Amino acid sequence: KIFRYLVLLASLSLHAAAWGDMADNGVECSVVMEKTEFDARAAFPDFKLVFTNKGEKTVRLFDDFYPLKDNGPHISIEIFWKLTKEKKEKVAAYYPHYCIERGQFLNFITLKPGERHEVLIKDAYLLMHYFGPSRRLRNGEKYELEVIFRDGYGDPGVRRKYVGRKDFSVVDQSPWR
């Protein structure tokens, strides 16, 4: 009997890793990168934040990704250096450091079951602040991109955090190697 529970638990944990990060409303958030291998000398590639409604009900998201034309996106971006499978260290981040006065005209994105919505994040390399002595990504290393979108208006009185992650590696693409 204990063996059955262990097998069931292992099965559920493997499925959870494949599902990605899903909020309590059934919306899964994932990151799709233009390139998952690039040279450290190249600009950080553009990526998409993808929201997929895997639930059974229609859901609405607060359309707050680019609230101000002249500022960066209203999301948090973090890059972690993957030291081991479990251990990682933050090497770069972008946090929106501006306040927005909310008016009466709020825009929402409606996702029916099975629908998805993509948000293109361009020129993230201009937004990132690198930490540590090297202040850059290093060739030959593996990293994880983590993007966080906080929605406090999609459902009245409910604050949700959507997290998307994607692994990538930085490789030397020099023609002289």
What is the predicted function of each stretch?
Residues 5-15:
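Bacterial N-terminal signal peptides
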Residues 19, 113-177:
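Surface-exposed edge beta-strand/loop patches
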Residues 19-26:
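Proline/serine/threonine-rich low-complexity linkers at boundaries of modular beta-sandwich domains
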Residues 30-36, 102-107, 129-132:
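Short structured motifs
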Residues 37-43:
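Short, solvent-exposed loop/linker segments at the N-terminal edge
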Residues 45-47, 117:
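Hydrophobic core residues within well-ordered beta-strands of beta-rich domains
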Residues 49-56:
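Asparagine-centered strand-capping/turn motif at beta-strand->loop junctions
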Residues 62-111:
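The feature marks short-to-medium sequence segments in extracytoplasmic or secretory-pathway proteins
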